[in-house]
């Protein structure tokens, strides 16, 4: 196979299954896909299927220059962010790298969604239903720039509230009313022309460290229509993951957050027939992607763990 596509993951150290999905999608469209991943150490699971590129921390002053050099040195065609701060880095890189496809929304959207307070204001401005701000019990405290469930506290008693305020700086957090209900992640894709290609809700049945380890696709029309509305409100493109919770007592649908990137359990939607990895390749190749609503409902994903081994003298 003579035709190649080189993909650079940003923060994709554990995304082995997604890397394999990209490789298979490449085979499907007649290309050899090579995976590279920008990491702080060489001892990451992604090394099993790709090449690790030793990198800098996201906050490093030289991050853009180093990534630009990496893109040139490894002849990168597509850049895919897997952590929130990397979406901002990608948006900035997009301005200085030609002939490279970046799977990101606009810088303004990425910057807004990275900050919990800014995103809350964005939701309010666009008249979306969000949990009220406040620390009346019970409440959830979210680190303003936290992601993947990091820096999140569920505070349900006065004792827990006292402990939270004793151990944390309140201004670093967004406090919201705790909403008990069913959580949904919605895997969306918009092509390079901002056309919505697919919207797949999946119910989060079990989570570990903020990531779904058991989820099932559900053709929930209310959530699909609400997601479509949201995607038309901002300058979104590429993969977008929207988080909702449906309140147990009222059936009200609250938006929790938007991650303008691939979600950690996007493989559920890919296996269901909404192959976002293939969409990304087609977008890079400037091939039209037809809208896809023909995905498998009630597909259950159960995540397992796999060990990887390295010789580290």
Positions of the model-derived regions?
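Short, charged, surface-exposed secondary-structure boundary motifs
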Residues: 46-47, 62-65, 110-117, 209-210
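ATP-dependent carboxylate activation and anion-phosphoryl transfer catalytic cores
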Residues: 74, 219-313
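Active-site nucleotide/adenylate-binding loops and adjacent lid/helix of ATP-dependent enzymes
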Residues: 107-180, 191-195, 221-224
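Short glycine-rich, flexible loops that bind phosphorylated cofactors or substrates
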Residues: 87-88, 148, 263, 267
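Short secondary-structure junction motifs
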Residues: 30-32, 172, 237-241
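ATP-binding N-terminal substructure of ATP-dependent carboxylate-amine bond-forming enzymes
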Residues: 1-102
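Phosphate-binding site of ATP-dependent enzymes
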Residues: 156-235, 245-254
């Amino acid at each position: 196979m003579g035709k190649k596509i080189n993909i650079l993951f940003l923060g994709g150290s554990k995304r082995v299954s997604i890397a394999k999905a990209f490789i298979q999608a490449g085979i499907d469209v007649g290309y050899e896909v090579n995976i590279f991943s920008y990491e702080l150490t060489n001892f990451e699971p992604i090394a099993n299927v790709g090449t690790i590129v030793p990198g800098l921390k996201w906050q490093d002053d030289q991050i853009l220059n180093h990534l630009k050099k990496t893109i040139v040195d490894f002849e990168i065609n597509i850049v895919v962010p897997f952590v929130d701060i990397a979406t901002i880095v990608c948006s900035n890189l997009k301005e200085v790298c030609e002939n490279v496809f970046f799977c990101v929304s606009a810088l303004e959207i990425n910057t807004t969604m990275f900050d919990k307070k800014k995103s809350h204001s964005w939701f309010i401005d666009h008249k979306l239903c969000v949990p009220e701000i406040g620390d009346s019990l019970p409440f959830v405290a979210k680190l303003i720039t936290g992601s993947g469930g990091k820096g999140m506290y569920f505070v349900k008693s006065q004792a827990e509230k006292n402990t939270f305020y004793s151990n944390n700086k309140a201004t670093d957090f967004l406090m919201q009313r705790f909403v008990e209900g069913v959580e949904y992640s919605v895997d969306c894709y918009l092509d390079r022309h901002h056309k919505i290609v697919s919207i797949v809700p999946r119910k989060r049945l079990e989570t570990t460290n903020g990531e779904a380890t058991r989820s099932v696709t559900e053709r929930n029309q209310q959530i699909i229509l609400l997601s479509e509305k949201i995607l038309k409100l901002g300058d979104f493109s590429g993969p977008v993951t929207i988080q909702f919770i449906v309140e147990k007592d009222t059936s009200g649908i609250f938006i929790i957050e938007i991650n303008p990137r691939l979600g950690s359990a996007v493989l559920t939607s890919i296996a269901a027939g909404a192959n976002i990895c293939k969409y990304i390749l087609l977008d890079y190749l400037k091939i039209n992607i037809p809208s896809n609503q023909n995905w498998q409902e009630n597909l259950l994903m159960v995540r397992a763990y796999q060990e990887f081994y390295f010789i580290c003298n």
